[in-house]
Amino acid sequence: ASNDSSNMIVEARMAMYLQRLRYGSSAVSHSDALRWATRGSAAVLGRQDIGEIAVGKQADLALFRRDDISFAGSHDPLAALLLCNAQRADCVMIGGHWRVLDGAIPDLDLPRLIARQREQAAALVARLN
């Protein structure tokens, strides 16, 4: 079984909940889980160029809108990332280049991509049958 959602926020939330279940709710904070997802992941990969926002690092950022209903009433923006269902970043910078703006990938032909994925999925299912 796998919980790989390709969503680092969801994975950090699950890691936090699993650790809280095992060690108690006060043993692990949202800051711990975010540190695992950033600096911790970089350390596991042996990467010095990622894991934090600092001069000389990759400049990878994910920005989330907090005016969505899912964040209503949140008082701690970092806790809200994990606890208020942050599903989709509004803007994403990778290596210093904006790759997602206003929730969309610039110049992506989404209908074409969806059609191609459906074709490939159908071909895979046909091969399995």
Feature locations, PLM:
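Histidine/acidic-residue-rich catalytic or RNA/ligand-binding cores of hydrolases
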Residues: 4-19, 76
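Amphipathic alpha-helix from the class-I
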Residues: 17-24, 46, 100
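Active-site core of metal-dependent hydrolases
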Residues: 1-6, 20-28
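Interfacial and helix-entry/exit segments of alpha-helical transmembrane bundles
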Residues: 25-37
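Active-site microenvironment of metallo-dependent hydrolases
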Residues: 10, 35-129
